[in-house]
Amino acid sequence: ENLVAHSGGGEDYIQMYDSPGDDVFTVAPRLATLTGPGYSHAGYGFYVSLGYATSTGGADGAGGRDVAEMQDSTGIDKVKVGDAVGRETTKDTVRVSNWSATDQPYFLRTKGFEEITVLSNGGGDLARIFDSAADDTVNASYDEVTIVTGSNLEKPGIARKKATIRGFESTIAYSVWGGSDTLNLFDSPGDDKVVLRAHKAEMSPRQADTPIFTGRAFSLVHAIASAGAEKYDYVRMHDTVLVDLLVAGYLDGETWASLSKPADGSAMTQMYDALGFDVVRAVNDYGDSPRNKKDVDATVDFLMLDGGWDEI
């Protein structure tokens, strides 16, 4: 069957619901389509477009594998993947919106889809991405940010398996729902700067005043500089109030450094590491009483030390 609905203007909204099979919801400002086994529906001109993957039927008993493809406008838009702790009803949603008085306002939302892609059409957009209660992985570059929901928990609380954000001028990813989340930062072919702190990781072009990507409260951060040959990449690692351990050397011919903090007992847990950077700067923000520790290969020539670091 094929159904088409047209808005006559005003603040009309359309809601579309999936089938027991594999469905695809495609939505952009003033346009929404939902297709699946034996049907295709479309809505035109609606101020608000909502897509729901709520069916539990089908051969898998879970309503199939449903995909959402979303686009924003050419204005200044906002995207929110999931939600903050305490907002249970919206943690499995993806929202795209623009309420600017100078742009044509709209609101798009999906709920319960296993895989979601959001494409920016420019305009100075901001994306915010929230984790699940599982062990999630975020892969971030300037062009694309992907979050993959961990499979370690039987019920991570959301249907989302993967969400991809492409082309956004600024993205913030949050690790707030629990689990042991990992953030992988990938550089560009140009000169890049990464700043790593225990509560926050930032990545930007070296001369930029503000970060393009920010990750907050991730358990582990990997920064990887592998794009392009003629470039100069810089990473700055900050310590904690504890007695941290800095390790630096070469890994398969590439520069490598890591910073770890004390965990239970005498064990150390790695906070972040950096691979392939031209310069690594380790910063002691909390003074020399007691001093941090370091284990640095004698051949290392890429490391800068701020403050006190005692050789182990």
What are these regions (language model features)?
Residues 1-312:
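Acidic, glycine-rich low-complexity segments
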